[in-house]
Amino acid sequence: MANIEKKNHNDLQEKLITVNRVSKTVKGGRIFSFTALTVVGNGDGKVGFGYGKAREVPAAIQKAMEQARRNMITIPLVNKTLQHSLKGSHTGSNVFMKPASDGTGIIAGGAMRAVLEVAGIHNVLAKTYGSTNPINVVRATMNGLVNMKSPEMIAAKRNKRIKDILG
């Protein structure tokens, strides 16, 4: 059920990663509800994810999209790829992402691919280790992207010039 829906809203790309039917067992039977996992990005370094729950599918998707728009982060990109190799983890999922040269494309699987596409990353090599649960993979990917540092940030932290950092 990966990447079912893609549309634009205020220059944001929205992707639906997964919709899941869950049930609660009560005395009279089962109560079904739905969960939706979505990612939103502007294609230029801003990305966010949302997880919505509701009794109907459209309501769950709408809640997830709104949450994704509220929880957006900015990541520093260079030439539509990552600044450096990075790792991210969340519960049982571990992800490894590595910058790639022009023309490589997004080499990543499932939920991680959707996050990287809407973030505006065009060339990257990525691998998921451990659990491939879409929610955990998206959270691990976001954790990795949050920890990415640009040369400007490193130079400011070390009180050095950028050219000293880059060599």
Swiss-Prot record:
Cellular component GO terms, alphabetical: small ribosomal subunit
One Pfam entry name: Ribosomal_S5_C
Record keywords, A-Z: Ribonucleoprotein, Ribosomal protein, RNA-binding, rRNA-binding
Quaternary structure (record): Part of the 30S ribosomal subunit. Contacts proteins S4 and S8.
One Gene Ontology MF term: rRNA binding
NCBIfam families: rpsE_bact
Highest taxon in the source lineage: Bacteria
Role of this protein: With S4 and S12 plays an important role in translational accuracy.
Family annotation (InterPro entries): Ribosomal_Su5_D2-typ_SF, Ribosomal_uS5, Ribosomal_uS5_bac-type, Ribosomal_uS5_C, Ribosomal_uS5_N, Ribosomal_uS5_N_CS, Ribsml_uS5_D2-typ_fold_subgr
Name the UniProt record assigns to this protein: Small ribosomal subunit protein uS5
The record's note on its domains: The N-terminal domain interacts with the head of the 30S subunit; the C-terminal domain interacts with the body and contacts protein S4. The interaction surface between S4 and S5 is involved in control of translational fidelity.
Organism the protein comes from: Buchnera aphidicola subsp. Acyrthosiphon pisum (strain APS)
Coiled coil feature spans: none
